[in-house]
Structures are given as structure tokens and as C-alpha cells.
């Protein structure tokens, strides 16, 4: 059994081919969204085990929760199927945790082969992450002590992300919940994978739904500060879309507040 286990949220897989495609070098779980319910295990030539858990359920949050339920590694890496891991990533991870043994979660860096993904930023230095600046980071590339997840009963929201009602945010809420439970979270510039994303499962442009969904997410994550976050977010996006002024963005996000109240 590997000390490190990669949990991949994926779609329409029929075998363990992703193990080689993603350059995996540890145990892995493929939480596979498709049209059947099945479970298979594959032993790799290097001795690692790949678990293929297929389900017809929809939503990336459900996928990630299934992977967590089957995980056995001391450290688990949340990953997407468009990631290609660098050689020796497991050693890089173990070295990082040995340097900061108090860490419950470390968010590593990714090298983007294109810049399709909106809002992703390269991390330039190692530092402690705080709640106020955590919303910009996703959990794909986050490495977490599995014991901390189980001890604190952490799971992903099934309302957000690809395949769910609202377009994104399940990973941001996971990190926020981790902070609320007292986990110590760090970020590091160490690259553990490359991303070759060419299309998004949720991002269809800066349309009305995008801003409404952001309002739903902010009302969930920061109920006491949601109005302040609206102005902050709208100011940052005011010149990005010619069809969405500062005031229109605020209006749409407040529609999201109302939707969240009625969930």
C-alpha cells in the first residue's frame, strides 16, 4: 500500500488507462462518472493498486466523496483527469510534510499548459494559508492527511461543481470547512503536476448564471460578510465582460443570495 494515494474525479473511463496517461506512480482511486455502477481493481507492474469506482450519479462533489470513502493512504491527493503528474511527485510531497509536520493540508503548485482555467494563479512562495485568501484555491493538487479528513468528518458539497446545480465552489467550501475545523493549511510553489485543460466542465463564460452562482456560493461561504464580498468581487470583474457592469454584477449576485435562502 502506498503512503500517498491519488483520488481522481473522472468521467467515462472503462479501465485503468488513466494510470499511465496521468503518469501516476502511487496507489490511485478513479471515481468515475459514467452510465453504470461497478467496482474493479487493477494491480500495476510497479505494484501499485488502481481502484476504478464507476457510478451513474452526477456531480463532482459526489465523485470526490466516493473516492474519499474508499481511500486508505496516509496522504490523499485530490486530482482531475486532465492532470499529468511529474516524476517523483510522491517524494516531493513527503519532503514537504517532513519540513512542516504540523500541516494537515498542503496545496501544491501546478504548471498550466494553457490558461483556459479562469482565476488560477501560480503560487510564488511557501506560506501559511488563511481563510481570507483561501477562496482562490481549488482542492485539485491539495494533499491532505486522511486522518484529518476522517477525524473532522470533512466532505464535499454536492450542490456545486461540474454536474451539479451551481457551477463551481465545492472545493472552496471544502477548504473553508477545513479552516472551521481547525486544520492547518499551507501553500507551496513546488510543482507536482501539469494541467492540459482544454475545456471546462462548468465554465461557459461570464454570463448571468456565472454571477448568480457566485452569489449563491458567497452567501453559503460568508453569510455575515456577503454584501462586502459582492462589492469586492464585482469591482474585480467590472471590466472583464462588456455585458456586465459593476452594478449588474451586484444585482445578479444578490439574486444568488435569494436563491441560497430558498435551497
Regions found by a protein language model. Name each.
Residues 88-121:
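Conserved donor NDP-sugar-binding/catalytic core segment of glycosyltransferases
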Residues 159-173:
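Acidic donor-binding loop at a coil-to-helix junction in glycosyltransferase catalytic cores
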Amino acid at each position: 500500500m502506498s503512503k500517498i494515494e491519488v483520488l481522481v474525479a473522472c468521467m467515462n473511463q472503462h479501465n485503468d488507462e488513466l494510470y499511465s496517461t496521468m503518469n501516476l506512480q502511487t496507489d490511485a482511486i478513479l471515481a468515475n462518472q459514467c452510465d453504470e455502477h461497478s467496482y474493479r481493481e487493477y494491480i500495476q507492474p510497479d505494484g501499485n493498486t488502481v481502484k476504478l469506482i464507476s457510478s451513474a450519479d452526477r456531480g463532482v462533489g459526489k465523485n470526490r466523496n466516493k473516492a474519499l470513502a474508499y481511500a486508505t493512504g496516509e496522504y490523499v491527493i485530490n486530482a482531475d483527469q486532465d492532470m499529468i503528474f511529474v516524476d517523483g511527485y510522491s517524494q516531493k510531497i513527503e519532503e514537504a510534510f517532513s519540513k512542516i509536520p504540523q500541516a494537515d493540508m498542503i496545496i501544491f503548485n501546478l504548471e498550466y499548459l494553457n490558461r483556459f482555467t479562469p482565476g488560477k494563479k501560480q503560487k510564488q512562495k511557501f506560506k501559511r494559508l488563511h481563510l481570507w485568501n483561501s477562496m482562490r484555491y481549488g482542492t485539485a493538487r491539495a494533499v491532505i492527511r486522511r486522518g484529518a479528513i476522517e477525524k473532522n468528518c470533512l466532505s464535499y458539497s454536492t450542490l456545486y461543481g461540474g454536474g451539479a446545480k451551481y457551477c463551481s465552489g465545492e472545493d472552496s467550501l471544502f477548504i473553508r470547512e477545513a479552516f472551521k475545523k481547525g486544520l492547518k493549511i499551507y501553500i507551496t510553489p513546488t510543482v507536482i503536476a501539469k494541467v492540459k485543460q482544454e475545456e471546462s466542465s462548468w465554465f461557459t463564460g461570464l454570463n448571468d448564471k456565472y454571477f448568480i452562482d457566485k452569489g449563491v456560493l458567497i452567501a453559503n461561504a460568508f453569510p455575515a460578510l456577503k454584501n462586502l464580498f459582492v462589492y469586492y468581487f464585482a469591482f474585480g470583474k467590472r471590466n472583464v465582460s462588456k455585458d456586465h457592469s459593476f452594478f449588474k454584477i451586484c444585482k445578479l449576485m444578490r439574486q444568488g443570495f435569494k436563491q441560497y435562502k430558498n435551497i
